[in-house]
Structure formats: structure tokens, C-alpha cells
């Protein structure tokens, strides 16, 4: 019985240490979550303004492309696509690209499994052959997952900061735009967990290339006129990649927010489970100790009675 008591004490001590670690990790994740939520709100204001400006500048190009699409059903000739509109031009989809955002490590609850499970289901539903799609992965978990299943992984990026920066995203966007221009894929979807609140996230798959979320009607009633130098085409050639960068950066910010929320929730749950286990083990220890004392008293009383 004494050995059993020692085993229980060791389990209690070990569980307490684990609980202290998970509680510290919960606090760290909570601090990161608070920080990135504040930054995400500020970034949303910037993103909305950039979208408005780009829509205004690209309005003419969008209308020209829409008219061209109506008058010419054969848009497969890529030589007809002007460089200014390369990120706006729709073309026949022979191959789809998926930029999948996951974390670099675990301890984030169901965050990664939700994205990867939904991603595999999407591939199963939308594609008949592995030649119809190509994968790009942000995060080590996703990259390792696709490699293990033999999927066509054309690009991977590991080590995104807990609070992402534009410098990190530029490399990703440059690669994605280059692959799109070179015909590696004809459309690109960014797939990630969208942050709803601390306890909830939802899988999202948003089309990023070609840029298709610009609505000319949103700026139709505005009287803003821009002084453009040297010319509109040159400005659009510079601005459109920046807009694509802002879209992907926004998705990464959203995904990182969901990751920190999932980590906070997972560590809180682990801490609560550790406390529950400590309570259970303490009760078990007290009962075992009480039984041991009772046994000793019984033996003493029995021995005294035998002497009489």
C-alpha cells in the first residue's frame, strides 16, 4: 500500500507540473491573440481603403475585360492578355492552385485537422485527377501532410511569425503571382480557418487569383478623381500585385488569429483537465492513505487483543 501511495504522489506532482506548463502556454497564447486581434482590426481599415482605391483605378480595365468576355468567347489565347490586366484576366481553368494555411506545430486543438480535412474533401469533390490541381502550403503541418500523401506540392513556406509582417508575405505573393503568370495554375484559392471568436473558427476557401472581388458599382457614385503619374497602366502594374499581397496578408492574419484562439482554448482545456485529474488523484490518495491507516490500527488492536 505504501508503494501505491508513492505512485499516486508521483502522478500528482507530474500532473501539477504539466498543468503549470499548459497554464503558462495559455497565458502566452492569450497575449498573442489579444495583440493580433488589435492589429487585425487596424489592418481591416487599411485593406478596405486599398480595395476602394484599386477598384476605382481598375474600373476601366474591369469594364473592358467584361466587354471583351461578352464579345469573344474564346479567351484561351494568353497572348491577348495585356500585362496590366494579367491579375484580372479570367481564362479557361485547366489547373487550380490551393494555398493552404496551417500552423508549424501542434498544440492548437482541431485547428489544423479542420483545414486539412475540409481541403481533402474539396479536392475529392472538385477534381477527378491529381493533374487538375497543385498545392502551396504555408505552415509545416500542411506541408508535411501533403508530402505524406503524395500530393503535388509546388511551394511551401515555414516559420511565419506569430504576428505576421508584410515582408514575410511578399515572398509568398511574388511566388504565387509568378506561378499564375507562368500558367502553373489558372486560378488560386487561399484556404484557411477564419477566426469567428475565441471558441469558434470556420473553414474558408477564397479565390485570390485572378482578382475577382472588385465591384465597379461600389465606386460608380464616387466623385473622387486621382492624379496619376506617369500613367494608369504603370500604376496598375504596381498596385495590383500590392492588392493581391494585401488579400493574402489579410488571410494569413485571419488564420493566425484563429490559430492563437485555438491554442488558447486547447491549453485552457488541458489546464482544466490537469486540475480535474489532480483532484481525482488527491481523493484517491486520501482514500488509500486512510485505508492504510485503518489497516495499521486494526493490526495494532488485533495484536493488543492477542496479548491479553
Curated annotation (Swiss-Prot):
Keywords: ATP synthesis, Cell membrane, CF(1), Hydrogen ion transport, Ion transport, Membrane, Transport. GO terms for molecular function: ATP binding; proton-transporting ATP synthase activity, rotational mechanism. It is a peripheral membrane protein. One of its GO terms (cellular component) is proton-transporting ATP synthase complex. Produces ATP from ADP in the presence of a proton gradient across the membrane. The gamma chain is believed to be important in regulating ATPase activity and the flow of protons through the CF(0) complex. NCBIfam families: ATPsyn_F1gamma, PRK05621.2-1. Belongs to the ATPase gamma chain family. This is ATP synthase gamma chain. It comes from Lacticaseibacillus casei (strain BL23) (Lactobacillus casei).
